[in-house]
Amino acid sequence: MKRLQYRFLLFGFALGSFGWFVASSAFTSVVKSNNETLSSDGGVHMRYLKGKGDVLSILKSKSPAITQRFDLKWNNGKKTEVYLNNVNNYISESLYAQEALKQIERTAQLSIQNGELPDVKVYTNSGASFGLVGWHTDNGRTWAFRHENKYDKNVHFSWNQTYYKYSNRERTASNPYYWKWVAWFDLGYANQRIGLVENDEYHIDKRVPEPTPRKWDKNKPLWGDIRSKILYSAERLDPDKGIFIWFNQTGFNTKGTKGWANSGFFTDFWDTNNNPNAFTTNITSEGGNSNWHSPDWGSHTTDTRFFLKLEPYSKLFYKENGQERSITVSDYIRKAKSTKTNYQWVNKNQIKTLVRKTRSIDLGLGSAVRQTYTTKSDIASNQQLKYKLKDSTFSIDTYNNFKLDKLLVPKTNEDATAIKNGVFVKQPTLSFDFNPVLTNAIVNIHNLFAQTLDLKEHLKSDQPYNESDKAAINKVIEQIKNKEVDYIQVADFIGKLKNWSQNPGSIESKGENTAQWYADAKREFGLNLNDDVNTWTQLSSLIASYFSKDIFANVKLNGAKERRMKVWDGAKFEFIPIENTEKQSEQLANENRAEIAVSAIGFQDEGGLRDASFINKVALTPKSSKTKIANGDASKIEKAANEISYKYHYRQNFKQASWDKQNSQTKSIVVQSTDLNDERERFQKDINNYLKVQGISETEIKVNAVHKVDAMLNARKSDDPKLASVQSTANKYGLNLRSNPYTGQFYVVVDVTNANDLGNQRRANNAKSYFYYIEGLDKGAQSSYLVRFENKQKLYSLESLAVDSRGLYVKNVSKDAIIQAKQNQNLYLDTHNWNAALKANLTNAELTLPTASADNSAKLSTPNAENDEGFLSENVSGSILGYVERMTGKKLFLKERVSFNKEDKNNLKLRLTSNFTLDKKGNLEVKDPSVINQIVEEAKGYNVLVSEEKGDDPESDKNIFKITLTTNPEQSTVIKLPYWIVTKKSKTNKDGTVREQKNLVFDFSNLNNFEYNTVVSLLFTDSSFIKNAYAPLQTEFRKQLKTVLEHKYQAPIKTGQLPLLTKVQLANNQKQIDNFTFDLHKNIFNKEDINKINWPLIAITFTGSAALLSTIIASGVVLHRWRKSRKHFWEQMLKARKVK
């Protein structure tokens, strides 16, 4: 079976063949062996088929009942027993519900790792099957289920008109499946379908934006009217979750093998999984796309709806000014949220959002002021200043006698008197909040205005509302105008209105039935709204204008000097901490007491509102329908005499422990209490041991429970509030919650029951780099923390192997493990058995390398986890080679990199195959003299390629040659060899040309042993001791050096010498050599010099093309001699110079 890949969910509403997960009567079936039906009931047969991926098959009778639920469970993680438990419910709770899929996922990890998907084949006993279902999991994997005809094994789509035809209806009492399918996606989203986003012209297929002809053409997929409506209003969409859209395949025909399945609808794209921005899908069968067809059952005219889930990174396409553009779903949702002009629903907890986002009116005395004058207040007897704003439909008057508890009320975020077992279990902070009466009034005013618009839209729509429904809608609109309902009642009415299976009825009211929110606001503020709902939003705007300014208060904390503090920043309230965090008197410190006093709350001093306090009355004059808001006279306001005072003994068992006693750079707490079986006790002991050592905690903390974050993530319970808080904390600090085997780090949620004993920073968000407070999980004195732990054993790559005089080791990556667990900085591997193996056979040695260090704190990972054998990198090969040379005192020259294979789970078998060895005196050692002849023959196939590469430091006088040496068809050694140029002397010839003698100094110091033994032995060493095997390779190397240098200096080289290392120098790792001397000729114009020039090299010079030269060097092309006469050559060269 070919792999089925999705980037979205696709469901077809062809409901004719649901036989594969429904039954006509209750049953329970247990399958215990392959290819055997053990029990059946109600026409349903269960069979467990053994095959690729293992196949669960459910055979069903022709009964159309859709009333059963099957829960799929796997026993002990093995696919040997499958239990299907029958529970009555709708199809949305069927066998393939999310929890069942999660169970399947846990049993198929191996299949996923191998890039496969488990096959689930579903048959009906008529030989037909429904279609294809996909499910997108949280971690990006996709489960795909294909359904085949059990006879010919080709994928079919068969429809039965009786059960799936919709005509032009969506949902009726007799046809509930439409909404149930939506509920299967996301019941919350489905119930919130309240409107469309602003632009419905977006489409998902930029190539075929219009419906194509209904004649099958594999090159023109039938997308139908893709530019269809988004299901939900912008306010309810989440940019991180994506969206669902629907579209129609209306009125097309299915005849023979030319059905919609064969139209290319499902076979448009192929998702390679390499492009996260692609919005693609493909469905294939074993027989190829041509096998997608419907049985020849005649014409099927339908109005079928398909739903697609677009992921956040999916692209939508649209046209702007005639140009086709694209936008991701996430950005589309954000744009819709920011540009949508209609109402936003709010609740009591979102009043601050309302205040922040609602348009505000400038209350300053700048250009907004039309006139100022003095008048008599109809509410107060004193004189006041009145501001009349430009283009406003109401005026604002200011009055005296402000009362603090009118529009704002002080509050603490916790009950400071709550004591349990002698401990204050909640730590208070002082803040302010909106008066609940004000909040409730604004929420109702805002939402009822919006709901009125919604209801009016319903009256205008073409929905088949009967006269009774229309009368009910009009009645509710009238009730809103008369302030007889609240927005919750209306929301319930609208919900029923949109749910066609329910009768919306009406909101009953008898006589004078003023809604509670309005009665409270009228009593508290004198609010008197007229009947015109359209003017209600003015009050929201007016409140927003007041709270768009900063608000300050005089605050005295712990007896310190009173200071002005901001309590509202124009968007949110600022908390005033009532904790022992400020400088305080010695007496207060000894008594563990905090005192706070707040007074004179008012706006920031500015303009005519200087020192003005808050609004205390809101009134509407019946004659003018203008809102008036009263507060103190801007010129005569007196600060309030009363103040808010608090005194707290805020921690009865306070030990004055503090995180600040030790400024540690610790990143994690190393797990050491491996002697304890109980996980909770183990982590509790490790935390306490560490905190005491660091001097952070004087009292042993008590751990109530621990939760490993890896396990929480694997469970993926979307309704887990603890996991949601943990992920929020991780996002805040940029933490990767998944465990890391290379650093050993992992995260644990620790519930500390006596969190007060952590000191006055119990809720410090990030007290240490390994300790994070998790907000929202406090229970009494218990707080939860995200703690980073570290295992003592780490996983190390073989690339990290290094060598010193003691042996092979990896460098410890953890300072915490070195300090806390007393680990060594270098973690050595056990190689005590290598001496014997090397003495037995040095030129073809087999060595055992343990995969764990001697103290078991380091575990080596193979280069390719999927293969048990292969070659180590040149770097690792060089490290192992260097260690072997230390042990033997001889230099090995390997034919290829060190190879490895897995001997067992604890050891690697290494093989070092060398051509020959040298001792420190340069003595050659080979077991068989014929090896020398073999080396000479093999060397004939070696090749070298040289080019120049710029170094990282442009100011450095060092240059870099990139040398590629190929000694094996499957392996090439590439090194970057630093060099610098020394000018020894220069000479001016009689003809005016200049001759400079230069030396190249090569630096071998950064080469590892493998690179040095390979490259230096072949290119820079006198190989006469092995019959000059590498002389031709060295000649080619010199030629390419000259070629590169001539290009560098844009001048020919007349002579060049390459003195070679001796075999003794090679055996002793000569690190530097001044080994290439050349004469550089500049400004050559006479034929005599040309006669002396090396012809292959001058052929590059006369072309005058650096680009051509670079191409020739890079591709390793061998230049041929210029075979024409010298006279002709000279003419061509002069001609070329004139062209320049």
UniProtKB/Swiss-Prot annotation:
TM region positions: 8-28, 1098-1118
Keyword Membrane among UniProt keywords: yes
Places the protein is found: Cell membrane
GO CC entries: plasma membrane
Keywords noted in UniProt: Cell membrane, Membrane, Transmembrane, Transmembrane helix
Membrane topology listed for this record: Multi-pass membrane protein
Principal location class: membrane
Family: To M.pneumoniae MPN_375 (in the N-terminal section), M.pneumoniae MPN_374 (in the central section) and M.pneumoniae MPN_373 (in the C-terminal section).
Protein name per UniProt: Uncharacterized protein MPN_376
